C-alpha cells in the first residue's frame, strides 16, 4: 500500500474555536509542526496553511484548511490536485464523537459518520477511500447537545487524555508514512 504524503487536520479557523473539541485535527497537525520545528505558511490558492515535515525518510505535506469544517473538502481537493497526491496517500485527522477522550483509531475508507468535514471531503472526492485518524472527544449523551459539545472546550482531564492520544498517534505515524498501515493500526490500537 502507498505511504502517506499528506496529513490534514480538520477544525474551524478563528480564535474563538482554537481550544474546542472540534479542533482535535488541528491540534494533531499543530503538534507535528511544532515537534519538527517547522512553521505554517498561508497558501491562499489551497485555502490553507501548509507545512512540510520529514518523517520516516519522506517529506510529507501538512495542511490546515482556513475554511470552516463543513467546507474542508475545497482546501483538501486543491492540495491533492496541486501536489498530485492520491486520496489513498492522505490521512485526515478529525474529532470523533463515538470515542471517549483518550481513544484514537486509524481507519481507511468509509462514510462520514455525521462528521461534517468528512461529509464535505467525501462529497467532493466522490468516495471515502482515504485514511482517517479518529480522535475521541466523547459524546454529550443526546444528539440535541452535539453542536454545543463539539464547539465547547474540553475539561482539563479531557485535554490531558486527548493530548496523550495525539502523542500515541504521532508515535505510529512513521509506520503509516512508510506504508505499513496494518503495523500502525496494530500498534496504535493495542492497549498496553
From Swiss-Prot:
InterPro entries attached to this UniProt entry: Pept_tRNA_hydro, Pept_tRNA_hydro_CS, Pept_tRNA_hydro_sf
Residues annotated as signal peptide: none
CC per GO annotation: cytoplasm
Residue ranges that the Swiss-Prot or TrEMBL entry lists as coiled coil: none
Family named by the database record: Belongs to the PTH family.
Its biological purpose: Hydrolyzes ribosome-free peptidyl-tRNAs (with 1 or more amino acids incorporated), which drop off the ribosome during protein synthesis, or as a result of ribosome stalling. Catalyzes the release of premature peptidyl moieties from peptidyl-tRNA molecules trapped in stalled 50S ribosomal subunits, and thus maintains levels of free tRNAs and 50S ribosomes.
Keywords: Cytoplasm, Hydrolase, RNA-binding, tRNA-binding
Reaction(s) this enzyme catalyzes, per UniProt: an N-acyl-L-alpha-aminoacyl-tRNA + H2O = an N-acyl-L-amino acid + a tRNA + H(+)
Subcellular location: Cytoplasm
Stabilizes the basic form of H active site to accept a proton, annotated site positions: 95
Protein name: Peptidyl-tRNA hydrolase
GO biological process: protein quality control for misfolded or incompletely synthesized proteins; rescue of stalled ribosome
Gene3D superfamilies: Peptidyl-tRNA hydrolase (3.40.50.1470)
Residues flagged as site, Discriminates between blocked and unblocked aminoacyl-tRNA: 12
Amino acid at each position: 500500500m502507498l505511504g502517506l504524503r499528506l496529513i490534514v487536520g480538520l477544525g474551524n479557523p478563528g480564535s474563538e474555536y482554537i481550544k474546542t473539541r472540534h479542533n482535535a485535527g488541528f491540534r494533531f497537525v499543530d503538534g507535528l509542526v511544532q515537534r519538527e520545528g517547522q512553521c505554517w505558511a498561508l497558501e491562499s490558492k489551497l485555502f490553507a496553511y501548509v507545512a512540510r515535515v520529514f518523517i520516516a525518510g519522506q517529506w510529507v505535506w501538512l495542511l490546515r484548511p482556513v475554511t470552516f469544517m463543513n467546507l474542508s473538502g475545497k482546501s483538501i481537493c486543491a492540495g491533492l490536485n496541486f501536489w498530485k497526491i492520491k486520496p489513498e496517500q492522505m490521512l485526515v485527522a478529525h474529532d470523533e464523537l463515538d470515542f471517549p477522550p483518550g481513544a484514537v483509531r486509524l481507519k481507511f475508507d468509509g462514510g462520514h459518520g455525521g462528521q461534517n468535514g468528512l461529509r464535505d471531503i467525501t462529497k467532493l472526492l466522490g468516495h471515502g477511500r482515504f485514511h482517517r485518524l479518529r480522535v475521541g472527544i466523547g459524546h454529550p449523551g443526546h444528539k440535541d447537545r452535539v453542536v454545543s459539545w463539539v464547539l465547547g472546550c474540553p475539561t482539563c482531564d479531557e485535554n490531558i487524555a486527548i493530548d496523550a492520544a495525539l502523542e500515541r498517534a504521532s508515535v505510529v505515524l512513521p509506520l503509516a508514512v512508510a506504508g505499513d498501515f496494518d503495523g500502525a493500526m496494530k500498534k496504535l490500537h493495542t492497549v498496553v
